[in-house]
UniProtKB/Swiss-Prot annotation:
It holds the Pfam family Tugs. GO terms for cellular component: cytoplasm. Residues 139-181 are annotated as: Disordered. This is Ubiquitin-like protein 4B. It comes from Monodelphis domestica. Residues 151-161, 168-181 have a biased composition (Basic and acidic residues). Residues 1-76 form the Ubiquitin-like domain. Keywords: Cytoplasm. PANTHER family: UBIQUITIN-LIKE PROTEIN 4B. SMART domains: UBQ (SM00213). The keyword Cytoplasm applies. The gene is UBL4B. May have arisen from retrotransposition of the X-linked UBL4A gene during mammalian evolution. Transmembrane segments: none annotated.
Length: 181
């Protein structure tokens, strides 16, 4: 079966694999095609992180499915190196600004509401939202994308709606035929 594997900034490749392939083997193929080290890869299918020891069929991944690759940052090798002090967090800075315009109690209430709205907005974000943000923040050609030869695809390939997956995942995930089709 053919799978599309897509990096956050839009690079993608088509890989031919078996549905019984283990996730760690797929990571090896992705590493060769997109030049992303296996240890830095986090593969996602429909928002679910794939475990290395599971098979693709355990996640009901079928032909023409699209997987996303999130690249983990490199781990620091020297723990003795003190980390650079970060700039002050957004919330204390925002609190200082609010205190200039509101009473302390009102500023606290406004800040609490802003934090709650911010948290809710982040929870609603999906990978497409992150990709759009990354394209704005990292102009085309400036990211460290893959340079190897890959077979480019045109647009996302939607999974087949009629595919029925009877493999019950340990978390109870079960793909059924869409209602109304």
């Amino acid at each position: 079966m053919w799978l599309t594997v897509k990096l956050l900034l839009g690079r993608r490749c088509l890989l031919q694999v078996s549905e019984n392939e283990k996730v760690f083997m797929l990571k090896r193929l992705v590493s060769k095609q997109l030049h992303v080290p296996e240890k830095q890869q986090r593969l996602l299918f429909r928002g679910q992180v794939l475990a290395d020891n599971k098979r693709l069929s355990d996640y009901c991944i079928g032909p023409n499915s699209t997987l996303n690759v999130i690249i983990r940052p490199l781990e620091k090798t020297s723990p003795e190196t003190p980390s650079q002090p970060r700039s002050q967090s957004l919330w204390p800075q925002l609190n200082q600004i609010l205190l200039k315009h509101f009473s302390p109690q009102d500023a606290e209430n406004v800040l609490r509401r802003l934090r709650e709205d911010h948290r809710k907005s982040l929870q609603r974000m999906n990978l497409d939202d992150l990709e759009r943000i990354s394209k704005v923040l990292v102009p085309e050609g400036k990211h460290s994308g893959a340079t190897g030869s890959t077979r480019e695809s045109k647009g996302d390939m939607e999974p087949r709606r009629n595919m029925k997956c009877n493999l019950a995942h340990k978390d109870g995930f079960k793909r059924e035929k869409s209602p109304g089709k």
